[in-house]
Structure formats: C-alpha cells, structure tokens
C-alpha cells in the first residue's frame, strides 16, 4: 500500500514557513499531520533531523522543494508540544516520534488482551510485540521503548504489572 500525500505536498509554498501567524498555524498543523501519517505508514519511531531533510516527507523531488532544517526543527518543536515527539539529545538532532502516544498503544494492547480472553496472563515483551498471536495487530513490531511506555501507562491504570523475568521483562494483565 503506497502512502497518500496530502494536496499541500505538491504546493510549493508549503515548503516555506509562512510569515502570517494564522497561515503558519494551519501550515504547521498540516506538517504535523503529514509527519505523523508518514511515520505511521512507514512504522518509523526515530528520526534524525539532517536525514529527515532528505527523506521524501520533507523533500518533494517532483516539485523540487524541500523544507529547510530550521523549518523541520519548527515542525518537530510543534510535535513535541503536542506530545508526539521527544528529543534524544540536547543538540536536538535525533528524536523519538510517537504517531500514537503510549497511552493509546496501551489501550490497543489491553483491548487485544481482553478480546482474546488473556486477562491474568503473563507475556514476555517479545511475545507481545513480535509473537505469532499478535501478527495481525497494529502494535505488532512495536519498538521496545514504546512498548515499555505503553505497559507503564497500563500499570499506572492498574491494568498491568511489568515484571522482571530471567530472560528479560514480561507483563501480567489484570
């Protein structure tokens, strides 16, 4: 399945941050939506700012336009404010991208556990994210850091407990 680009993607001014405040807000909202949709489609969880400039999401070769590194930083900062991005370093060169927040992943995981009658069951993190039983689930292949945060959110809600096992971490659902 190929990614469907929004109409703005082929509109050259989209690749230049607009000076008008209202226009810029709409533009940033569109960029945030595009970045999250693209990362979701490609199942990307980490981004490098310099590499991002060359990626298709910020570089439309068809119209020969790309967003500047400074503008990418502005988009990323907007995503951070919304809770969809976390910087991995002080230089703000690499980040975690959360096209779905940990609480949302936790909810999806718990729905699957409940739907399949697996409450009071124990899983290894590997089984949960990479097991045969979860192959058709959206959380299949979820990176460990996000899986752990999702389970921590469930633990906070009293729906799960993260446990340490001989071969790593596991989780019990309630």
Curated annotation (Swiss-Prot):
Component of the ESCRT-II complex (endosomal sorting complex required for transport II), which is required for multivesicular body (MVB) formation and sorting of endosomal cargo proteins into MVBs. The MVB pathway mediates delivery of transmembrane proteins into the lumen of the lysosome for degradation. The ESCRT-II complex is probably involved in the recruitment of the ESCRT-III complex. GO terms for molecular function: protein homodimerization activity; structural molecule activity. This is Vacuolar protein-sorting-associated protein 25. One of its GO terms (biological process) is protein transport to vacuole involved in ubiquitin-dependent protein catabolic process via the multivesicular body sorting pathway. PANTHER family: VACUOLAR PROTEIN SORTING-ASSOCIATED PROTEIN VPS25 (PTHR13149), VACUOLAR PROTEIN-SORTING-ASSOCIATED PROTEIN 25 (PTHR13149:SF0). Pfam families: ESCRT-II. It comes from the Eukaryota. It comes from Danio rerio. Belongs to the VPS25 family. Component of the endosomal sorting complex required for transport II (ESCRT-II), composed of SNF8, VPS36 and 2 copies of VPS25. Signal peptide: none annotated. GO terms for cellular component: ESCRT II complex. Its main location: cytoplasm.
């Amino acid at each position: 399945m190929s990614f469907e680009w929004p109409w703005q993607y082929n509109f050259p001014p989209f690749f230049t941050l607009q000076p008008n405040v209202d226009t810029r807000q709409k533009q940033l909202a569109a960029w945030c939506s595009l970045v999250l949709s693209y990362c979701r489609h490609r199942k990307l969880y980490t981004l490098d700012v310099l590499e991002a400039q060359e990626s298709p999401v910020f570089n439309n070769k068809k119209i020969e336009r790309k967003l500047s590194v400074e503008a990418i930083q502005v988009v990323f900062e907007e995503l951070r404010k919304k809770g969809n991005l976390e910087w991995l370093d002080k230089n703000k060169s690499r980040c975690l991208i959360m096209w779905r927040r940990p609480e949302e992943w936790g909810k999806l995981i718990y729905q699957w556990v409940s739907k399949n009658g697996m409450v009071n069951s124990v899983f290894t993190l590997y089984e949960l994210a990479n097991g045969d039983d979860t192959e058709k689930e959206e959380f299949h292949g979820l990176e460990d850091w996000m899986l752990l945060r999702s389970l921590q959110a469930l633990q906070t809600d009293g729906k799960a407990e993260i446990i340490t096992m001989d071969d790593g971490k596991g989780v019990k659902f309630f």
